[in-house]
């Protein structure tokens, strides 16, 4: 994925994203996966995770005389049981742990404020806080430091030589990444200082392997047409690959006089970056990995930071477990999981998405509400993708569009409960906003669901007619049919307080979605396709982006996958550029949009992390939600 930026990109794929389409279907549903029982694994014998198109005959209760042939995806039941989820407990609750955390927080604050503003140590400390997942505690301090750094080095002084670290690749690349991450448009030309007279990066830079790794990570903050950053990506990739090859040679290790711990740490970090760059990773997963695999082994490990990071992770995890238990009780009470055995019951996986979107302890309401949406999107997606007839799907779409609970009697029996739960859930969310802000947002929320269901319906029509869409047609529909737009629209109202007329004008909900939402949704769609398209085609579904590209260009599957990865990289460049028309959108909301893309890449990195319930999915859920980090007493 790291090499994708060297390709040419067709701007029509992103720039022609539609105003609210009247199409249908979704793959956002593949967001969710396992299920476990008290053990924690259910004692019920698991079925194969492969989805097969199975024909089954079902009598339509609405029309007793008619027999309908329906498809089945043969989804596994959930492995995470209600009883197991309710049994989750942790010791990391209560005032004693909070007092301990606050004491450590004061010590870390003193560290931050005690370092000289232009020191490399200060940059490294900020980077370490981020990778340990605790930088959110010091948001104001970090923002103040970086603002002063940017002002001193790039506003008041236009000459790079005034930067004391100007000839240090590691320091400059780290500073560039941190400043761009926080919204400062540091010029890419800063890296020209590391080029020779021919305009090529100096070969001696490869001796600074951590500097090259920082350069590689910095290149992912590129925007469109930033050619210097494209060059840094190519150069750093080549250097890192050569280093990895050298480290496989025992003689080279002796020549370089590196100890095994240093080599292993470097190789771990490089492999980790090649899998996904830091900019594309979710905070919570990165924190657990960095704590477990890297930080304790570092020679300059700070015991205060380490203790603070582990304790904070466990305290926040205890809040996540409470949120999950609340969600589990809601899911049990609405009884959808047991009534619709053709659909995926993916409660735990839905919650994992929410942890990726907003993990901080203070956002419990956001997680509890938004996780319901993930669950409902999965269920409704399976109705459209697998079970419903075209006539039934048109009825359901019309009912959502008219938003009248009286229409429930016009629906087939199996659709009544999903429609009723959807109607009640969205109205409940609207009521919460009305109480808190005296603002009626039901029309906005409803519209996002209407858009989604129309997209589902259009994809169903494609399927039943055997239509082969072009890649452009598919992406114009697919960025909406993935369902992420529904999540983000609801997230906006959860995270924005107060809601102003200027905010609503920026959203332009009556016409189209903001670019930041479109971009996040497109990455989510493409990541989903990379992870799930084979299984979906096996069970009977419309062609995905991979197959559309193969059809359009007479390409192989490998070539198509490379192109989809390239589109993801190009869309990230669009998302890296702040749209002035969206400047009034809150920082929290913009970050959640980016986190949607990051979480999709995390979920689908190694296949269908939402629906397959494989060992990797179970391990991720366990480490992030269930199992605390060991803290010796």
UniProtKB/Swiss-Prot annotation:
Cell compartment(s), UniProt: Plastid, Chloroplast
EC nos: 4.2.3.15
Entry GO CC: chloroplast
Top EC group: lyase
Residue span of motif DDXXD motif: 381-385
Cofactor(s) the protein requires to work: Mg(2+); Mn(2+)
Chain positions recorded as Mg(2+) 1 binding sites: 381, 385
Pathway noted in the entry: Secondary metabolite biosynthesis; terpenoid biosynthesis
Cofactor: binding details: Binds 3 Mg(2+) or Mn(2+) ions per subunit.
GO BP terms: diterpenoid biosynthetic process
Name used for this protein in its record: Beta-myrcene synthase TPS15CT
Organism name: Cannabis sativa
Gene name of the record: TPS15CT
């Amino acid at each position: 994925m790291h090499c994708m930026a060297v390709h040419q990109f067709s701007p029509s794929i992103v720039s022609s994203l539609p105003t609210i389409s009247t199409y249908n279907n979704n793959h956002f549903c593949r967001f969710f996966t396992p299920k476990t029982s008290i053990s924690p694994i259910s004692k019920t014998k698991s079925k194969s995770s492969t989805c097969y198109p199975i024909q089954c005959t079902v009598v339509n209760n609405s029309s007793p005389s008619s027999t309908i042939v329906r498809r089945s995806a043969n989804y596994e039941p959930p492995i995470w049981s209600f009883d197991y989820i309710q049994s989750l407990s942790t010791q990391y609750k209560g005032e004693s742990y909070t007092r301990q955390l606050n004491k450590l927080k004061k010590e870390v604050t003193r560290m931050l404020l005690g370092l000289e503003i232009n020191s490399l140590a200060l940059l490294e400390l900020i980077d370490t806080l981020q990778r340990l997942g605790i930088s959110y505690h010091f948001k104001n301090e970090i923002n103040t430091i970086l603002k002063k750094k940017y002002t001193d080095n790039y506003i008041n002084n236009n000459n790079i030589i005034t930067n004391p670290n100007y000839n240090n690749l590691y320091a400059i690349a780290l500073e560039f990444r941190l400043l761009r991450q926080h919204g400062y448009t540091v010029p890419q030309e800063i890296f020209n200082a590391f080029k020779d007279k021919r305009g090529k990066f100096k070969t001696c830079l490869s001796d600074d392997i951590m500097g090259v790794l920082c350069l590689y990570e910095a290149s992912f903050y590129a925007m469109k047409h930033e050619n210097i950053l494209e060059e840094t990506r190519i150069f750093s990739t080549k250097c890192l690959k050569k280093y990895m090859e050298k480290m496989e040679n025992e003689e080279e290790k002796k020549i370089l006089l590196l100890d095994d711990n240093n080599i292993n740490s470097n190789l771990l970090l490089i492999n980790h970056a090649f899998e996904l760059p830091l900019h594309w990773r979710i905070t919570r997963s990165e924190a657990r990995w960095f704590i477990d695999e890297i930080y304790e082994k570092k020679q300059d490990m700070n015991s205060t930071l380490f203790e603070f990071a582990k304790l904070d992770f466990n305290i926040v995890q205890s809040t996540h477990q409470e949120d999950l238990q609340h969600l589990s009780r809601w899911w049990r009470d609405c009884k959808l999981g047991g009534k619709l055995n053709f659909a995926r019951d993916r409660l735990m996986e839905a919650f994992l998405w929410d942890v990726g979107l907003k993990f901080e302890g203070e956002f419990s309401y956001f997680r509890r509400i938004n996780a319901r949406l993930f669950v409902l999107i999965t269920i409704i997606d399976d109705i459209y993708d697998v079970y419903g007839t075209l006539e039934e799907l048109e009825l359901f779409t019309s009912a959502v569009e008219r938003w009248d609970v009286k229409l429930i009697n016009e629906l087939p029996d199996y659709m009544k409960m999903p429609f009723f739960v959807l109607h009640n859930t969205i109205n409940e969310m609207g009521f919460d906003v009305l109480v808190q802000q005296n603002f009626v947002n039901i029309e906005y929320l409803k519209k996002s669901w209407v858009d989604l269901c129309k997209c589902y319906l259009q994809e169903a029509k494609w399927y039943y007619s055997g239509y082969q869409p072009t890649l452009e047609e598919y992406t114009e529909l697919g960025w909406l049919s993935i369902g992420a737009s529904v999540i983000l629209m609801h997230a906006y109202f959860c995270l924005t307080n107060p809601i102003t007329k200027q905010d609503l004008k920026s959203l332009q909900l009556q016409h189209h979605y903001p670019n930041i939402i479109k971009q996040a949704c497109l990455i989510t769609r493409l990541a989903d396709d990379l992870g799930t398209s084979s299984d979906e085609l096996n069970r009977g579904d419309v062609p995905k982006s991979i197959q559309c590209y193969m059809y359009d260009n007479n390409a192989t599957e490998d070539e198509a996958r490379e192109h989809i990865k390239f589109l993801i990289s190009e869309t990230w460049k669009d998302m890296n550029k702040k749209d002035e028309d969206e400047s009034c959108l809150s920082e929290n909301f913009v970050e959640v949009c980016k986190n949607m893309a990051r979480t999709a890449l995390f979920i689908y990195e190694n296949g269908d992390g939402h629906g397959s319930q494989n060992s990797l999915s179970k391990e991720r859920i366990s480490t992030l939600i269930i199992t605390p980090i060991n803290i010796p007493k």
